[in-house]
Amino acid sequence: MDDFRDYEYLARPAATGDRHLKSCEIRETAALIAASRAPQATPTNGEETRHAEVWPLSFTKGLPHDSDGFVDPKAFHAFVTAITEPDRPGLPHAFDVPLGPQAGLAPGGNTPYSYKPRPEYALGWRCTRRDGAPLTVRAWESPRAGHVYDLQGADASDIAMDAAPALGSEELTAEMAEVYALALLRDVPFSEISAGGTAFAPAGLSAHAAFTGLGRLAFLNARTVLDGLTPRQADRRAARFDQTGAFTPQTMFRGSTPGAQTGPYLSQFLLVGTGTCPQETREGLISYGANTIDQRVASLAPGVDHMVDFNSWFDVQMGADIKDLQTADAGRRFITTPRQLASYVRVDQLYQAYLNAALVLLVQGAGFDSGFPEGTGKSRAAFATFGGPHMLALISEVSSRALKAVRRQKFNIHRRGRPERLAAMVDKVASGAPGKLTTAMRAQLRTMYLNLDKAGLMAPVAAHNAAQLATHAARDGSYPLTGLGHEAALSHLLPMAFIEGSPMHPSYGAGHATVAGACVTVLKAFFEMFTTPDGWTERLMDSVGLGCSVEPNVVADGAKVDFDRSGTKLVDATDQTRLTIQGELDKLAANIAIGRDMAGVHFYTDYYESLRLGERMAVTILQEQMLTYPEPVSMRFVSYDGDRVLIEGTGHAVSVTIFGKNGRPVDYAAWLSRAAQAPVPA
């Protein structure tokens, strides 16, 4: 509990001068709350130091690399220095770092005056655009955002994340296996994945085979005892299992909360629209004032993956900007497959999914938290305060702050490489061309490869990549890149949904997941999640006219999905488990975050830890905003870890009270720092 009753301010008449003083007192109290949060030491996995000068799993994208794909140490050191060095007051930061190929400056690239690359790093592009346009270079996205401050909520240094899984760990092997499996299941319907079926295997792997193979891995096999896990690692492992402690098709690729593991894979908030009857909500059209939002999405073309050869992989690591070459499918459909969800999270706006969910709940009459002073009585309606405008604005407020907070983790602390990089290191060991990898690195990567092969993933990945290369070559000149490495027909590179690969920022934490964690926390805090004002029984989706779960239709032509006729309408879901509003909101956060894993650009831990970072950013903002209300206000929700969280304001003080899943009180400061190593000494 965090209680600021010592900083009470006196009630005064509403005279102009007195109001000004009271406003200042409130701001001072908010500053005291902010000062009470101890800066947290975020632990790292130590690989940037342990693997120095090689950095097989660090984020090196955009920097000069040698012909084997290893970064120039001089450029990497310059990159880290440019990220971490303090600002100079009154002067802009040049961020003068080598960017892109150094064999002749590519459009958008950069060669600092002080940087003189050795010949092995002065390389050019390997591929060319078929349309004849020059390949250009992408810039890093907000690499200095970790130095920016905010005036609401915890500072970016006050909330920590756990260390990312390290090379050699069972956890890293498991989450690399998940990303490989998702790449091969991109065109398999979610309903088939949740059922663990065998009907569809367009890339050589069925949902059942994926489940069986993943279950062979120690981290995902509940019967295997793993010694030496930290409590945090044990929590992440337990999140892969159901309530009985089993790994099942229903938990495979799902989020870490009970709601995310219940019912159909996709949250109803990604599918349904608004309306007064099921026939209307199944149209998937959301009322947005005088406009309408259609839940159908434009998708990437099915069956087309990228970066399956070393040449295109290499150019992407050098920062090639080829996003405009992505092939799209015709028409719009309801999200039916992992590729379609990946398509959504490639182009979605920052808080789009949560805005849509908020609109659905608003129009369907979900009602706000019973602890609000407006909206529940006869004479005061909620609008500017505790109403729709208040809540919708708050979603955007927390989203931007969450995004800046996770940028500090990404660039300033972890600098974790993307899955596409780890897969390339696995491929190097598998192909017998390890390059600069040390003996210890080779041994760890070899063990990972053998475990991935035991899971039944390496052979179908190699076969799929070979088939993709052959298809790209046979497309009558329509594939947008030339110069692909067709000689590497058995690569174990990660097939990517996006032609440009991952974004130009590190993997850990994940921006989508952090924003999801923050925005869904606001939705759970603002809308009434429970059946009674003093109870914790969750409200069902029935209460907002969405009781019958739906999923997109799937039309099959033998063992193939007919994508032209699938996803055209919503039908009754096979799984009709009764769903709760809070559970579907938690599932929405998981869908958006793990949708990035389906594209191949993130790991599971990126989702898990970032979700909780965003949640804490939102709670600290809500805590401070409680000071601005001159009368009693409260809001409550269940956290992603299952804690019961109550935020209260009395009109002159604020408190945050938390009870864990076991019913015992949890210290608020300890809750905020749950992922931290230890508080930073003052």
Task: Set out the residue ranges of the language-model regions.
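Hydrophobic alpha-helical bundle signature of multipass membrane enzymes
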Residues: 1-682
